[in-house]
Amino acid sequence: LDMDNDYGLIKQSVIKADGALKTAVDEKSGIRILNQDFFETLISFIVSQNKSIPQIKQCVKNISHRFGDEVIGYNGEAFYVFPDVQRLHDATEEELRECKVGFRAPYIKNATEAVYSGAVTKEKLDELDIAQARELLMTIKGVGEKVANCVLLFGLGRREAFPVDVWMKRIMEQMYFDGKDTKKQDIEAFAVNKFGDLGGYAQQYLFDYARTTLF
């Protein structure tokens, strides 16, 4: 739950970076960026492409149920944890397709092989600067800049990462570019310059606030 970070200080720093975010920060003050497992985050964001949130959740649940271990919760209810690299590496592409991941099945296989072989690991990524880490992640089939930035932010603790999807592009254009169509790369560069190491936090406040308020 990212309890080691002082969110009071983080919120003050985000507002200091841009006073226009005060309302967003105040209204969405409970937002936290969770410290999530790298491998699960990688696969989940590969699955997320062109899917709705309910569909993504169902696919991840299907993968966990098919390949993960059963765990009994405190109330006696059974659930399944996300499988480790070995378990998913042993899965066939056809078995993955049965989890309703569609065209993403070969991407999941490629990502799993990259992690299993040691070509792309959390340890390697942690040693690189953010640009190098993004480039290494994008050697995995199906991982573009947006997915790579999401993995950096949510699965590797790189809080300076600023993922830009269709929604975030629209939000940033309206708030900072007078509504003009702007390239995602230019938006990301602007965010890096404006928010620095706070980029991921600013992105989360902006994303949640704007989706429920501006549109």
Language model regions located:
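HhH-family (HhH-GPD) DNA N-glycosylase catalytic core used in base-excision repair
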Residues: 1-215
